[in-house]
Amino acid sequence: MLSDKGLLLRLYSQNIDGLEYLAGIPDDKLVECHGHFRSATCIDCGTTADADSVKNTIVKNGTVPECKTCGGNVKPDIVFFGESLPDRFHRLLRTDIQEADLLLVMGTSLQVAPVSMIPDMVECDHRVLFNREPVMKIRTGQDMFLPGDCDDHVQELCSILGWKDDLLKENAKVQIDDSNNKKKAEGED
């Protein structure tokens, strides 16, 4: 919704499940810091592979998929521990930390660097943490910590801003397909 209202500079997500993408966050507004499962690449030659067939090979056979081009190993486009984050993360963060006028931090442990450092890097005056636990230093008079469930706080904030109907419409777009235990956006197959 923030994107639809022209209020989102960028959404940085540590999740690899792609739910932000399915929720309709535009590619130019979304940084999936640790990658996603929507695509896969050969680690030797860089050839892209069908993500669904890679997933099936891993899940059904318990084996590492082979590249059809060079025979190398294919992995989902996710960042494993010890691997570098995508260049796009670093490039966008350099400008975003200067341009943001408000930082919303939601549902995170802030345990994994370099994403954990973003709240301290951002140069804006106000930061709001929606989280079960206080995971960052709160600056008196500048920051706000809202303990509890993120969904509850988002609903309350939308009500205060007069966006409750918009939130209900957005929630209706995303459905859970229990047969696959997979989230799908409206209109996607």
Predicted regions and their residues:
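Conserved catalytic alpha/beta core of Sir2/sirtuin-type deacylases, generalized to analogous enzyme cores
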Residues: M1-D189
